[in-house]
Amino acid sequence: MICSVQTLGITGIQGSSVVAECYISNGLLGFDIVGLPDAAVKEARERVRAAAKNSGLSFPTSRITVNLAPANLKKMGTHYDLPILLSIMSAAGSIRRPRSTSAFIGEVSLEGTLRPVSGVLPMALAAKKAGIQALFVPKENAAEATLARGPMVFGVHNVRELVAALNGEVALTEEPAWIPERKDSHVPDFKDVMGQENVKRALEVAAAGSHNVLLIGPPGSGKSMLSKRLPGILPDMTWEESLEVTQIYSVMGALTAKEPLVTTRPFRSPHHTISNAGLAGGGSNPKPGEISMAHKGVLFLDELPEFKKDTLDMMRQPLEDGKVTISRVVGAVTYPAEFMLVCAMNPCKCGWHGDPSGRCTCSDMAVQNYRGRISGPMLDRIDIVVEVPAVKFEELRNRAEAEPSAAVKERVDAARKVQNERFGEESGMCNARMGPEEMRKYCALDEASAALMKQAFDAMGLTARSYDRILKVARTVADLDGSETIQPMHIAEAIQYRAVNLGNR
């Protein structure tokens, strides 16, 4: 007898419909799973057999073949345990055949309890798209599944409970839609930072247009402290952005039953020893890397020159495209990677180059070699470069409260509102993402601004990409200023953010 049970698969963060087909036949005793399963799926044979017996079900002593269709799609993960078990029990006549409009997800333990799995939200969204009416998941994953706002979701504790429900002996209660609670944000505030007003202004401009930033300054000047406060002035995430980011964290298994939705902008700060796969994503079964975990948020790279050169250069394409593609023999996986890059570095190896105290022990050649670890093409993708001077004693002694993040955020929100009206709110585009067509339309310069731009282009030896970056930053400065056109003072401020000489661009 053949029986089919609906389930779901996942590739990257894209869910898809999968059918678990079971055929029980006479012949030598055996249990085979086909349909391009990975090791975790193949191991389901032992988990399913033990779970069935410990749940009071009679496991067939015949030849069992389970096919996970479509067979050309790589099947990865332990969430196939439950549909495999149900297809076998249905084919054996031990339980009622599940409806074709119901889908099942879950890992089973040897005693028959259902354990939470990763990637439930992308699969729930795929179930919604496929017209699935009822989705059965482990109880711990129920809140996450309801975020899809699609099929009815039923949280299940164990196999016994589910079998009783399928046989009509008990009725399961539909899970209510999870609604995020309003709570105070724990993001650090700009008011804690004394001085550094020029740097705060640069970060405000960066947040308003989603521009990439490089902070250069001696140890203890506040580079990390300022960067960690950047998410607090970014606009609140929309529902669509939260869902997109949550799908990435769901695939990584980084969600909890109490907090199934990511509602704050991510801030990721990997160590400079991180591998290429850790940063961009990878593995035999490709998983998202730090650049995808920072999607719609901030990726902070401290001690930038200490990162391996090939690791930094690998980020160049994701910075342009807003996504990263990982290719393997079985296929390619694409993860979103649209983030603000914030980097920090010392001006030299010892950290004190240019300090008035003369503490620097580095030669000019050593300074150039240190800064030269960052390639010119990588620096071209950074819109704003700003020096962070050492904090003066008078500023530390000043107990007057600095401007809070909430006040800065109001200005950033106003500038983003202008950009939403300009590009269309649904596009989610910011000034930093403008293409050639948008730049011709919204970054036109008058004669005075063009003359200033030409002077800077010739004097600073700018590249075409640097020229575009300056125009985009100037457009953001104008938006913060409430100006429809780019004025010379906006160009001047944008040029100021490219004036730091690193000797390699």
Show which residues each predicted segment covers.
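Walker A/P-loop
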Residues: 215-256
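Walker B catalytic acidic pair
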Residues: 296, 302-303, 314
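Short beta-strand elements
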Residues: 18-24, 279, 383-386
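Conserved inter-motif catalytic segment of the P-loop NTP-binding fold
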Residues: 239-275, 282-283, 389, 430-437, ...
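Basic, amphipathic alpha-helical bundle interface domains used for macromolecular binding and assembly
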Residues: 34-45, 60, 67-77, 285-286, ...
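Conserved alpha-helical scaffold flanking the Walker A/P-loop in AAA+ ATPase domains
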Residues: 204, 261, 265-266, 276-299, ...
